[in-house]
């Protein structure tokens, strides 16, 4: 198999093929260059690595188990393993990245972090990491998400963060990102923008991917120990794409199908979805060239998903590259399919997944119909479903 990692280093090339880059106002070039130099310096620093490993183990709860879902496997007639990122402190994979970036900010001498959040998971994880490391935190949240994720808003405030609801635009994640970028322009001398996914201008997609790659590194060792070799496929949900990139990246050079599941919402034909790789086109937003849901003039379209964390009109540039080159496959699951998978996993395994993760479970259930009994699927269970209880209760009533 072609050595994909050589082509996906990011680094000073700033791009993944034609995707990525640094499409930002001139005023943001200095902080981005400062961040790139700091990351290049500290990522291999022994003290930085030791402290990161310590916090991931003793604070976040790594390594997470690779759980053989015995009941679900029996029901579907295929072996299904779940990478249990839902068991991390905070209930999702987001803490892998926030601890890494908050620690980097600390090593850079920054006093404050800002972040955007959709479902609230990244905001909570940022507030946790900031509290842990003694940093001031402000979280920007689209007003629509602010209303439907009130419990996470309370959590962030309890953890000491200031939460700002963004009323502009479509009042969702993309608008929260815009506000965070505006803040950073004015405050970068003492503030680090702790971006939550593999999106944004270089070097953010590379930094976030590297901090999330611990998922795939662990899963690779664990599946070899459990099955004696590689799985047939790895499945993960894709919004911005950080949990998927985290588990995919260490497997890029292996003979394994890598499948990203986008939010199909009410169906692609309806126009009410968040599937930018499936139905989008190339464009520029938030400092990067990637695939976006946009009209002919390049204006971003409104998105929809039952899952707030997948409700973003674009996707990380590395995913765009992996789609273009054919290394990864990207599919969709609609709201109803995700809700059915949410119920199925809860009843069969006693595990309540996040609605984001339920999209990946739903596609694994679809795939199982075409597979053999000894085939092996690994699903990244990126988060737990506590935050989604009210939404699911209303939808299933």
Swiss-Prot record:
Cofactor(s) in the UniProt record: pyridoxal 5'-phosphate
PTM-bearing positions, type N6-(pyridoxal phosphate)lysine: 94
Keyword Amino-acid biosynthesis found: yes
Transmembrane segments: none
InterPro entries xref list: Trp_synth_b_CS (IPR006653), Trp_synth_beta (IPR006654), Trp_synth_beta/beta-like (IPR023026), TrpB-like_PALP (IPR001926), TrpB-like_PALP_sf (IPR036052)
Entries under PROSITE patterns matching the protein: TRP_SYNTHASE_BETA (PS00168)
Catalytic activity: (1S,2R)-1-C-(indol-3-yl)glycerol 3-phosphate + L-serine = D-glyceraldehyde 3-phosphate + L-tryptophan + H2O
Record-listed E.C. numbers: 4.2.1.20
Keyword field contains Iron-sulfur: no
Keywords tagged on the record: Amino-acid biosynthesis, Aromatic amino acid biosynthesis, Lyase, Pyridoxal phosphate, Tryptophan biosynthesis
Pfam family, one: PALP
Entries under NCBIfam families matching the protein: trpB
Role summary: The beta subunit is responsible for the synthesis of L-tryptophan from indole and L-serine.
Subunit structure: Tetramer of two alpha and two beta chains.
Similarity-based family: Belongs to the TrpB family.
Name recorded for this polypeptide: Tryptophan synthase beta chain 1
Classification lineage: Archaea, Methanobacteriati, Methanobacteriota, Archaeoglobi, Archaeoglobales
């Amino acid at each position: 198999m072609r050595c994909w990692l050589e082509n996906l280093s990011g680094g000073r090339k700033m791009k993944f093929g034609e995707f990525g880059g640094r499409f930002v106002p001139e005023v943001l070039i200095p902080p981005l260059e400062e961040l790139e130099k700091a990351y290049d310096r500290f990522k291999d620093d022994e003290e930085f690595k030791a402290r990161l490993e310590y916090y991931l183990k003793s604070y976040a709860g790594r390594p997470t188990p690779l759980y053989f879902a015995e009941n679900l496997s029996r029901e579907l007639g295929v072996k299904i393993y779940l990478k249990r990122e839902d068991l991390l402190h905070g209930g999702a994979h987001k803490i892998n990245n926030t601890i890494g970036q908050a620690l980097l900010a600390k090593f850079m001498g920054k006093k404050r972090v800002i972040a955007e959040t959709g479902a609230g998971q990244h905001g909570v994880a940022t507030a946790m990491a900031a509290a842990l490391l003694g940093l001031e935190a402000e979280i920007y949240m689209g007003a629509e998400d602010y209303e439907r994720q009130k419990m996470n808003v309370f959590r962030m405030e309890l953890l000491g963060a200031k939460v700002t609801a963004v009323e502009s635009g479509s009042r969702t994640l993309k608008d929260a990102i815009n506000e965070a970028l505006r803040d950073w322009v004015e405050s970068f001398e003492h503030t680090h923008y702790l971006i939550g996914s593999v999106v944004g201008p270089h070097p953010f997609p590379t930094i976030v991917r590297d901090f999330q790659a611990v998922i795939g590194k662990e899963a690779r060792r664990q599946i070899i120990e459990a099955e004696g070799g590689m799985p047939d496929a790895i499945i993960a949900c894709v919004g911005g794409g950080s949990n998927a990139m985290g588990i995919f990246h260490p497997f890029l050079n292996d003979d394994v199908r890598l499948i990203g599941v986008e939010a199909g919402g009410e169906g692609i034909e309806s126009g009410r979805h968040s599937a930018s790789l499936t139905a989008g086109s190339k464009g520029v937003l938030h400092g990067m060239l990637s695939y976006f849901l946009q009209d002919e003039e390049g204006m971003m379209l409104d998105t929809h998903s039952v899952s707030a964390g997948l409700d973003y009109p674009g996707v990380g540039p590395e995913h765009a590259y992996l789609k273009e080159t054919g290394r990864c496959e990207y599919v969709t699951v609609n709201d109803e399919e995700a809700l059915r998978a949410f119920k199925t996993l809860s009843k069969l395994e006693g595990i309540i997944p996040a609605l984001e993760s339920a999209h990946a479970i739903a596609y694994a259930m679809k795939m199982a119909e075409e597979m053999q009994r000894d085939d092996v699927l690994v699903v990244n269970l990126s988060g737990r479903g506590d935050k989604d209880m009210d939404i699911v209760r209303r939808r299933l009533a």
